[in-house]
Curated annotation (Swiss-Prot):
ADP-ribosylated by tankyrase TNKS and TNKS2. Poly-ADP-ribosylated protein is recognized by RNF146, followed by ubiquitination at 'Lys-48' and subsequent activation of the Wnt signaling pathway. Residues 248-259, 727-736 have a biased composition (Basic and acidic residues). Keywords: ADP-ribosylation, Cell membrane, Cytoplasm, Developmental protein, Membrane, Nucleus, Phosphoprotein, Ubl conjugation, Wnt signaling pathway. It comes from the Eukaryota. This is Axin-1. Residues 759-841 form the DIX domain. It comes from Gallus gallus. Residues 44-61 have a biased composition (Polar residues). SUPFAM superfamilies: Regulator of G-protein signaling, RGS, Ubiquitin-like. GO terms for biological process: cell development; negative regulation of canonical Wnt signaling pathway; positive regulation of JNK cascade; positive regulation of proteasomal ubiquitin-dependent protein catabolic process; Wnt signaling pathway. Residues 434-508 are annotated as: Interaction with beta-catenin.
Amino acid sequence: MNIQGKGFPLDLGRSFTEDAPRPPVPGEEGELVSTDPRPVSHGFYSSKSDAVRNETSTATPRRSDLDLGYEPEGSASPTPPYLKWAESLHSLLDDQDGINLFRTFLKQEDCADLLDFWFACSGFRKLEPCVSNEEKRLKLAKAIYKKYILDNNGIVSRQIKPATKSFIKDCVMKLQIDPDMFDQAQTEIQCMIEDNTYPLFLKSDIYLEYTRTGGESPKIYSDPSSGSGTGKGLPGYLPTLNEDEEWKCDQDTEPEASRDSAPSSRLTQKLLLETATQRATSTRRYSEGREFRHGSWREPVNPYYVNTGYAMAPATSANDSEQQSMSSDADTMSLTDSSIDGIPPYRLRKQHRREMQESAKANGRVPLPHIPRTYRMPKDIHVEPEKFAAELINRLEEVQKEREAEEKLEERLKRVRAEEEGEDADISSGPSVISHKMPSAQPFHHFAPRYSEMGCAGMQMRDAHEENPESILDEHVQRVMKTPGCQSPGPGRHSPKPRSPESGHLGKLSGTLGTIPPGHGKHTTKSGMKLDAANLYHHKHVYHHIHHHSMMKPKEQIEAEATQRVQNSFAWNVDSHNYATKSRNYSENLGMAPVPMDSLGYSGKASLLSKRNIKKTDSGKSDGANYEMPGSPEDVERNQKILQWIIEGEKEISRHKKTNHGSSGVKKQLSHDMVRPLSIERPVAVHPWVSAQLRNVVQPSHPFIQDPTMPPNPAPNPLTQLEEARRRLEEEEKRAGKLPLKQRLKPQKRPGSGASQPCENIVVAYYFCGEPIPYRTLVKGRVVTLGQFKELLTKKGNYRYYFKKVSDEFDCGVVFEEVREDDTILPIFEEKIIGKVEKID
């Protein structure tokens, strides 16, 4: 098979092709297959041998290199190479005929340089890197670079990445010729061919016609005028025979015809005009205008067959003659000998049609194998099996992990819903249900922190997942579903790390104690509950007593009480009579939110507290000391370290409170703070950092009054609050130490005279970045530092700060003084603080 127009040799075989559209005449199977495009005789019907020669069969060419020199009759024909071209690009480029046909297609698309560059790179890589070939390799590399890569407008250069072109340029300029220097560029061009031009080639007319003609390309003829009878021109259809004209088959007249008109196989304007009537009335053709053909029968007249899904081999003359007979009285039988058609037309229309269909099936429509031109082979078809298996295993494992994670999440969500339903049932079930769920007397640190997400009525034993991310998600889901619409404080794991020698165990302890309702320990003598509030909220009450009773108790007594409370906080004692009715506990504990959380910005319902509640709490603490349970030596040592750290913090807090609060106004201010809810109108006794925090805090609302059976919100981590309070108090103490004595004493004298009067506010006005209208706001207290002023600015950045003050340096009497230190107190001008904020360029 050759597409260059040379034809097949005459010794291709002496047996007929079994898949040819028409079998040979009986007795003529052994005749030579002729490849001459023109008949030898000068008449319409010469002889049987001439007629057989004109019926060239090239669907499956006979090759002389077979075992017997020919393919025996009835043997299975091999798959033609042109069908393998559709499998992959390498199959196409491994066949010389495929390369030639593909290059012809690329020339039509003006991108033949892609294929030439690919072969140039392959040839360059095959050159052996020896001394004799060094100069040759250098010249070849320069030629490839200059022709294909240097020109940025060329199609090859446009498809290569800039980094690849830069690498090749460096290699050529530095004379570092490497056999693999063009590999990356060749790979990029090959990818472009596989993605674009190769699929278009499989869908192109030139390839489909080539497969239809059985390995002959009708678009690559040699000019018939170049020499008839030499076998260089592939056979085609006869020229259109017009009415009242005689067909000239003489080879001598062919040059004249070629000069007058285009070759017969080409579609020209003249031929279109001449055949317009016949094409328009294809079903009403004249009987005189029969179409005679020679040579190959496989070239389609109508391009309708090009885009069909299956490559069919239409016997055009036979099919057209059958269609013609439907509307005329022409004969439907074609003979291959020299006799004329003499069969009269059929009388019955139905039988006529059936015979016509059978004839069409016998004479044409030989199906060829389906060409999957729309099917793309996978790009990774050449991946090694080991690599492919490893990649497949990894992907399957990822899918399996995702599915397992989804299943676990669904199970946990179902468990959370079941626990919510179970909590409602446990509240009304009584102490018999609770006694089975509450653990017996054990140290707190032996339990997982997930107990912090349950109330006393709904606690269940679970597995500990300390550092498992999924357990963190479970805790968050439970917390959100239990307290919708409220802020979700962390269980202590995400809070700032306290400076405790055993902060890990303490964090677990605080998380475990975080959500126990405070009212359960308030009346231990009434309900029999040994889980007293002193143990659950020990750290909060330490801060509370230091804050309010530091001046009423000596230092040694405070430390002794703290020691006793810490030792009691690590025991969990549960009686069988642990619960009274739920509504009674909640109704008695409406005002039991800890006071220190009020001062730190985490208030619950602090407005209902009174001194009576504090005394009851103190009594509850003294009762809880009787239920101490000894632990292991390690637990005792750990508790002693924690106790020592807490006592140090209490000393610092008590020392600060003694210096800042006078004994005369403490009790009045205490009662005032306890009966007032958290709001912006804080007394002067509240520190500036507390007031600044209170302005930004979103108060969580909890419907205690509307629904008494609803459990309270989870309490924040007390250790985190102690640590934060200690740090801020130290900063406040340092800042207060820098102030003059008069300024430190001035804000503390006002609350002593009248504790019920609200603190005095000061107006702060400032011009921001040259704006003509100032911003005005109120700040509590008479002392405002630059750091507090910066918190008022909504836009953060690098600014210079100037404040108006009285000065005798200039005639105007006032100046704008620049303030840079955050601890500097801002000057007051006419009972206001007037400033200017200028941006630093």
